[in-house]
From Swiss-Prot:
Subcellular location: Cell inner membrane
Spans traversing the lipid bilayer: none
The organism's place on the tree of life at top rank: Bacteria
Species of provenance: Bacteroides fragilis (strain ATCC 25285 / DSM 2151 / CCUG 4856 / JCM 11019 / LMG 10263 / NCTC 9343 / Onslow / VPI 2553 / EN-2)
Name used for this protein in its record: Putative membrane protein insertion efficiency factor
UniProt keyword Iron present: no
Length: 73
């Protein structure tokens, strides 16, 4: 069940990376990018904790937030 939920959560991220991201300028302040971070977090920690980590990261990605190298814990 967790594998199916992870797959469902990853589909919109892959769609964003393939179809939307190429049409917009790079804007992520972190390395790896927020979408790559979300993929890694969901694959490493599962759908629940991975989604939590991804949302936290996306909320930190703004002009007044941090920047630089921020790997998945």
């Amino acid at each position: 069940m967790k594998r199916l939920l992870s797959y469902i959560l990853l589909l919109p991220i892959y769609f964003y990376r393939a179809c939307i991201s190429p049409m917009t300028p790079p804007s992520c302040r972190f390395t790896p990018t927020c979408s790559q971070y979300a993929i890694e977090a969901i694959k490493k920690h599962g759908p629940f904790k991975g989604l939590y980590l991804a949302v936290r990261r996306i909320l930190r990605c703004h002009p007044w937030g941090g920047s630089g190298y921020d790997p998945v814990p």
